[in-house]
Amino acid sequence: MADTAAVHPTADVENGVSVGKRTRIWARSHLRRGASVGDDCIIGENVFIDLDVQVGSRCKIQNNALLYHGVVLGDEVFVGPGACLTNDRYPRASTPDGSLKADTDWVVSGVVVERGAAIGAHAVVVGGVHIGGWSMIGSGAVVTHDVPAHGIVVGNPARRIGWACRCGHPLDAMLVCAGCGRVYALRDSELVELN
């Protein structure tokens, strides 16, 4: 753990967790062994970060968020309060023979979230999903399929309703951002920045 990291006394940071410089971990959060959190992150209260989860630098994970084994967050990712990033598409408590599942019985299918994406409050992202950079997941959305870079998705199941700028504002019909003036174009179904 970096000397400049700040960990609340009620947080449970297990042995083998890597915490970067100037990262702050608030009350009652639990980071399990093998987890890695980059520099300049804020981990809110009561956050759960499971085994081997990777969190990039300059991320903000709000209160009560749950990041399960297999989750990888790029730099500058926002995870809203109560959001849940899962890791098992076919969960069961027991094996077909009726015995309780052990760690080795789980097939982990993690979630990958690229740089700058934002996941809204109480959104659920199922295992195996890839969230493109600078995308925006609406509050309460249930994401069952990959989200393209800059895509805005909402609902249950989540569906794309538009495109987001790097600054977070939605793009207009001409793919221009009213917030910062950036201009985009669609090329082979991918949004690319022109300026």
Question: Where would I find each of the regions flagged by the language model?
Answer:
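Basic/polar N-terminal segments that are highly enriched at the extreme N-terminus
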Residues: M1-A2, N195
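Short microdomains enriched in Cys/His and/or Lys/Arg
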Residues: G181-N195
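Intrinsically disordered, low-complexity terminal tails/loops enriched in metal-binding residues
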Residues: R115, D172-M174
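Short cysteine-rich clusters marking metal-coordination/redox-active sites
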Residues: C165, C177-C180
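Structural signal for interior beta-strand "rungs" in well-ordered beta-sheet cores
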Residues: A2-P96, L100-V154, A158-R160, R166
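Short, solvent-exposed secondary-structure boundary motifs
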Residues: G132, M174-C177
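Cys/His-rich microdomains that often coordinate metals
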Residues: R160, H169-D172, V183-L186
